[in-house]
């Protein structure tokens, strides 16, 4: 599993015959090895030599409730089985019967939810005389409704986490944009990749491939994407390729561990995306060109290495181009168009990795990306079980009245004037749109506390107090929009 499926090569066999033993990196303690804690070896181990200590002694497999669901810790959309007992999260396993990703999970999807140790918000809170105090749901909604009505709607801002379901994103947009006409409805964070893919679709239509292209590829050009840290299971699909046969062109902002797996590689640390695209374009047919020579002169030894490697482009049978958040920016749109035209000329498949779990759906619904977190008299923050974004926290410090719907007490909650308790991922059902266009269902696995509510439930309550009803048909909105990939 470690080598053949994950491509990490941490585990191996030492000694022979009856003395052979499973070891990590030449027999060092597992915690000191190159193990990435994905847990896939633990799940498939047939003997029990490797076990999950967090779920030990919490019951037999038949004592647990199994809920087939989807991972929402990135936009890849791996399938997983959430295992619970007595309304407690016991363990998360990969769905070995799934057709995508061989049932693999990474540390984020398997262990991070189980390790969650933040303090839950269990009741609505309001800040009075500098201190947070309990308040009833009805009173909390009255306070929020009064604040929204007391100000010019165009000055109000509303932000939401990309971890929210499509249902919650759609209701959020319907409430704040369609009904309240607020000045800004946006996702947290700086990632523009989903919005970029939609802009490119206006000219090129459904130009993207699904993640299955990674399995078929014999060469990859990766521009501004970190598959190891941000999308580990997608990284597994490349890491397990034979390093001496697979061709890798890797252009990143910072050092990238994926390069260590391949000998036939060009690694450029920096944002030389346009130069690399020009090199590729020059080599779509055999031979050289003046532009290539000019780039080589400008870039020096690294570019000469690129020149030698890119001469092999003609031998690539199934190349894939992977674009990430460091390159997929609206300011790079024209360069990206040049890349798409090149890919169509040479038959290369293109995948744009799309930020947070549901940022693709959010962009299709019309939510803004990379917002300016400036001052506003009232701001609504639908965070859910997401983590505090420093950019957003800094923006909150300059704001007016702050309404925060969150599952946990964190930096957002410390700045809030009203805190509304939110359900976590396992406590509500909802749909998610993956980076390659699959609409998947996250099934409820836990029963929430009596005070926890979803974003949609909170906004429905506010709509009732404001005298209007919410009408949100997310299926029609998402599927009718021009998309960079055919939605499934």
Spans of model-derived segments:
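N-terminal export/assembly segments and adjacent metallocofactor-ligating motifs
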Residues: 1-294, 464, 468
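Non-catalytic alpha/beta scaffold blocks inside enzyme catalytic domains
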Residues: 189-487
């Amino acid at each position: 599993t470690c080598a053949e499926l994950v491509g990490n090569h941490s585990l191996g066999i030492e000694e022979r015959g009856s003395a052979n033993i499973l070891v990590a990196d030449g027999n060092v303690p597992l915690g000191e090895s190159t193990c990435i804690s994905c847990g896939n070896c633990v799940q498939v181990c047939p003997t029990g030599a490797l076990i999950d200590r967090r779920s030990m002694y919490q019951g037999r497999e038949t004592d647990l409730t199994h809920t087939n669901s989807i991972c929402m810790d990135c936009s890849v959309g791996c399938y997983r089985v959430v295992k619970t007992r007595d309304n407690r999260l016991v363990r998360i396993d990969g769905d070995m019967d799934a057709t995508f990703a061989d049932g693999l999970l990474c540390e984020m999807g398997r262990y991070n939810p189980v390790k969650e140790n933040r303090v839950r918000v269990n009741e609505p809170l309001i800040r009075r005389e500098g201190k947070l105090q309990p308040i009833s749901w009805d009173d909390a909604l009255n306070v929020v409704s009064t604040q929204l009505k007391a100000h010019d709607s165009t000055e109000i801002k509303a932000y939401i986490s990309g971890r929210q379901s499509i249902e919650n994103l759609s209701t959020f947009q319907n409430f704040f944009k369609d009904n309240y006409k607020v000045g800004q409805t946006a996702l947290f964070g700086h990632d523009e990749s989903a919005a970029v893919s939609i802009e490119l679709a206006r000219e090129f239509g459904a130009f993207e491939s699904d993640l299955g292209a990674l399995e078929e590829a014999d060469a990859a050009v990766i521009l501004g994407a970190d598959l190891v840290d941000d999308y580990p299971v997608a990284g597994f699909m490349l890491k397990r390729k034979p390093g001496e046969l697979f061709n890798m062109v890797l252009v990143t902002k910072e050092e990238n561990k994926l390069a260590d797996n391949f000998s036939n590689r060009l690694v450029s640390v920096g944002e030389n995306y346009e130069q690399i695209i020009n090199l590729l374009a020059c080599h779509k047919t055999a031979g050289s060109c003046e532009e290539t020579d000019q780039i080589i002169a400008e870039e020096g030894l690294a570019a000469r290495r690129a020149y030698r490697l890119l001469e092999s482009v003609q031998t690539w049978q199934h190349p894939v181009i992977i674009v990430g958040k460091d390159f997929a920016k609206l300011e790079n749109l024209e360069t990206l168009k040049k890349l798409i035209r090149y890919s169509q000329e040479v038959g290369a498949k293109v995948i744009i990795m799309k930020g947070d779990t549901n940022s693709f759906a959010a962009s299709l619904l019309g939510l803004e990306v990379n917002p300016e977190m400036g001052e506003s008299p009232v701001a609504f923050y639908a965070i859910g079980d997401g983590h505090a974004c420093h950019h957003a926290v800094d923006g909150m410090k300059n704001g007016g009245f702050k309404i925060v719907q969150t599952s946990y007490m964190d930096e957002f909650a410390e700045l809030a004037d009203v805190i509304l308790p939110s359900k976590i991922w396992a406590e509500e059902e909802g749909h998610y749109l993956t980076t390659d266009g699959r609409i998947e269902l996250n099934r409820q696995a836990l029963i929430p506390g009596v005070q926890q509510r979803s974003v949609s439930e909170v906004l429905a309550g506010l709509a009732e107090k404001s005298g209007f009803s919410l009408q949100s048909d997310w299926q029609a909105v998402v599927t009718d929009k021009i998309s960079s990939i055919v939605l499934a």
